[in-house]
């Protein structure tokens, strides 16, 4: 390991319980359904937060995060890594300048094969090094499938 003295935590709540006084900021890159809870705790503790997308899964969670961030008066950012690249910035410039006319409709396409629920993998025991219940966090309980 590159940093053998680095402290490791299996649960973000344990990190905050033990190290809240020793940290100024956090990067939330946990399972996506735990982004809002982890970000909320960090903001309540007055920590700066960089959170991977999605920040939340519901409008209510987003409103809560916005309120907590405003109260904490800390820096926050949601990660949208590729959207900071030159090709995305160029499109924004073209739209804002009017070079392509008024945009009235946008169509998108995604080539990822997201499951529509028809494919149901069989359940397996979770690997020994994975705390499946902890990973599920606030998500609905379901069997582990590799």
How does the language model describe each region?
Residues 17-20, 97-100, 144:
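Surface-exposed acidic, glycine-flexible loop patches that form ligand/cofactor-binding
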Residues 14-17, 93, 134-137:
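Charged/polar, solvent-exposed surface patches and flexible loops
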Residues 30, 107-110, 139:
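Residues that line or immediately flank small-molecule/substrate-binding pockets and catalytic motifs
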Residues 10, 83-84, 142-144:
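Redox-cofactor-proximal catalytic regions of oxidoreductases
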